[in-house]
Amino acid sequence: MIRTLYSDTPFPPLEQALIEPNGLLAAGGDLSPERLISAYRQGIFPWFNPGEIILWWSPDPRMVLFPRELKISRSLHKTLKKNDYQIRTDSAFTEVMQACAAPREDQAGTWIHEEMIAAYTALHQMGVAHSVETWIEGELAGGLYGVAIGRAFFGESMFSRATDASKIALVHLARQLENWGYGLIDCQMKTAHLMSMGAREIPRSQFSKRLNQLNALPGQNRKWYFDFTYPGRSEQ
């Protein structure tokens, strides 16, 4: 059994999460900024289908990318050195979420629905949720969004409309977070795409311990502006 959350119900200990399905911890509650921030501080995130009860997750193991461990392939390195794209931050947050929500060939549906978009847009307006965007010829070509608390970034989703556009955004995010002293990017669950860029699984207990340390550090709680430029590129 998992705990049912009401408006004032705290999250249960992470150790109470189910083994199958992996990480299911609680159901119910709401997507208020207070609830979401409390969840992310503890390494918990919402994931549920539209029209269904809110489900809260904390899988074990946890997929993370430590910024210093980022891997860049030769082909991506060549792409990153070009001057045919521009990186922007927090200039099209809701548009990025909507693009991430668009149907994909390998998915029957999407968990990024209007309720989620409204909730994370509220976090964005508070300076807690952020988007990193790759623009090509004035068009949004790819990007990602997530939540930043303390010195941890919790990646939620990414999309590409052009080759490597989401990877370009991730590289710039990782390098900028490293410059700011952030300790990790939470990737939630294992994917081959993220593993190819250096992400790896760690035990939930290790993730939770590191998260507690990063929560105590001051972060960039404002609209983001990146000062990182990939080596070999000119300023845009």
Curated annotation (Swiss-Prot):
It is found in: Cytoplasm. It comes from the Bacteria. Coiled coil: none annotated. It catalyses: N-terminal L-lysyl-[protein] + L-leucyl-tRNA(Leu) = N-terminal L-leucyl-L-lysyl-[protein] + tRNA(Leu) + H(+); N-terminal L-arginyl-[protein] + L-leucyl-tRNA(Leu) = N-terminal L-leucyl-L-arginyl-[protein] + tRNA(Leu) + H(+); L-phenylalanyl-tRNA(Phe) + an N-terminal L-alpha-aminoacyl-[protein] = an N-terminal L-phenylalanyl-L-alpha-aminoacyl-[protein] + tRNA(Phe). It is an enzyme of class 2 (transferase). One of its GO terms (biological process) is protein catabolic process. Its EC number is 2.3.2.6. Keywords: Acyltransferase, Cytoplasm, Transferase. GO terms for cellular component: cytoplasm. Disulfide bonds: none annotated. It holds the Pfam family Leu_Phe_trans. The keyword Phosphoprotein does not apply. InterPro entries: Acyl_CoA_acyltransferase (IPR016181), Leu/Phe-tRNA_Trfase (IPR004616), Leu/Phe-tRNA_Trfase_C (IPR042203), Leu/Phe-tRNA_Trfase_N (IPR042221). One of its GO terms (molecular function) is leucyl-tRNA--protein transferase activity. Its main location: cytoplasm. Belongs to the L/F-transferase family. PANTHER family: LEUCYL/PHENYLALANYL-TRNA--PROTEIN TRANSFERASE, LEUCYL_PHENYLALANYL-TRNA--PROTEIN TRANSFERASE. Functions in the N-end rule pathway of protein degradation where it conjugates Leu, Phe and, less efficiently, Met from aminoacyl-tRNAs to the N-termini of proteins containing an N-terminal arginine or lysine. This is Leucyl/phenylalanyl-tRNA--protein transferase.
